[in-house]
Regions:
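Glycine- and aromatic-enriched mobile tails/lids
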Residues: 2-195
């Protein structure tokens, strides 16, 4: 229980709220393991969702909204559709374009980085300091390319933002793996440089 472990072990409150007031986390966002199972993530997400609703009900104040901020956020959210519309006619295949990247290609790149450098299945769940640092270098390239995400539909627009969120989560995960040098339960990941 909570009283049996040092305070540093607990990253947030008991209701899955992070250290940012009103921001709740579940699944991969709550631990250093890239192999959280969907059943546990589902249960954790349900719990975090219920706690978020309780927090909202207890802290229900109307914010002051600046319409210019809303307009800027709307433009940012819809940018992948504008990128596709602006550049889609320059190639014969809309999936291949030097001016944008479609969500599926972005997802494949992200998965490849995490699988090969963050202790995924293709690396036999092994990683090391050098592998993690290389993964972070490749993640920087992916972040640069994230501004070129393009969407042909509302479904792809959702996939673009899902990829951006996954990219930031993956970056945090790589940073966590780099910081925590111990092996985490053989089968989850193995630090070959500090076994």
């Amino acid at each position: 229980g909570k009283g049996e472990l040092p305070d540093d072990y607990f990253w947030g409150d008991a209701g899955n709220m992070t250290t940012i007031n009103g921001l709740f986390a579940a699944g991969d966002a709550t631990g250093a393991s890239s192999h959280k199972f969907s059943s546990g993530s589902h249960a954790e997400g349900r719990f975090a969702g219920k706690q978020a609703v309780k927090w909202i009900m207890a802290n229900n104040t109307m914010p002051e909204v600046n319409q210019a901020d809303v307009d800027a956020l709307t433009e940012m959210v819809l940018k992948p559709m504008a990128v596709f519309e602006e550049h889609s006619g320059i190639t014969s295949d809309p999936d291949i374009n030097p001016n944008y990247i479609i969500p599926q290609q972005f997802m494949f790149r992200l998965q490849k980085i995490m699988d090969e450098y963050a202790g995924g299945v293709s690396a036999a769940f092994k990683t090391s300091d050098n592998m993690l640092k290389r993964g972070l270098e490749l993640m920087d390239f992916l972040k640069e390319d994230s501004v070129k995400l393009a969407a042909r539909s509302l479904n792809e627009l959702e996939r673009c933002w899902e990829n951006i969120h996954r990219m930031w989560q993956a970056d945090a995960h790589l940073q966590t793996l780099l910081f925590r040098t111990e092996t985490r339960w053989p089968g989850y990941y193995f630090r070959s440089d500090t076994p």
